[in-house]
Amino acid sequence: MVAEIDNSAEEADDGDWMTHMLRSSIFHRIPASNIQAVFIKMEAHPVRAGDVVIKQGDEGDYYYYIKQGRAVVTRLTKTGQTIKLAELEAGSSFGEEALISDTKRNANVTMLTNGVLMRLAKADFAALLQGPVLETVTYDEAQKLVGSGAATWLDVRLESEHKNAALPGSINIPLFMLRLKTASLDHSKKYIVYCDTGRRSSSAVFLLTERGFDAYLLKDGLMAIKQAVHP
């Protein structure tokens, strides 16, 4: 009898996190077959308070969804200071930046409490989520959208890079600050996201889409503009 009650509670708990995850705007863009595969491929990963789930500088291996627990996102600066970027709770996801941009982890994620994470391996993430979610536009298409007032440029490079060369009228929010700064963006606007090559901006588009923003990736980044001007 006890086993039956425990199993029912576990099934209800599984249903709750899956239902919550399906509310993400990400799942509005992917086929039903992909959604089913995501839930099949995801594996449970128990964690304890103090566990470092992601370490800055490491290679990206998994995309994470917090089923239970809370975590903190921090970044170590070049001067040795630790900056707190965000606190994550059940229903939050993290780890997509390094997977999409194929770069090293740009922050630490440490558990504040015991919990359970659901994780998806890099190859499965790329095949099931990343591909269908990222919508790209060419430089010509982006120019028309921005010129008509239908969209705004969003530069996710570092502030120093933005000051050195940026598209007129663009907003600058470095990728590593984007989680913290999304509240400053307008859900009623479209955003054309760019960086130098498209790597960082790909991560930004995924993160923004996940949060319900209408975001598009400038294909090939600023390199596309250089090619358009100097073919």
Predicted stretch roles:
Residues G169-I192:
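Helix-loop module immediately N-terminal to the HCX5R catalytic loop
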Residues H162-P168, L185, A228:
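Short loop/helix-cap segments at secondary-structure boundaries that form the rim of catalytic
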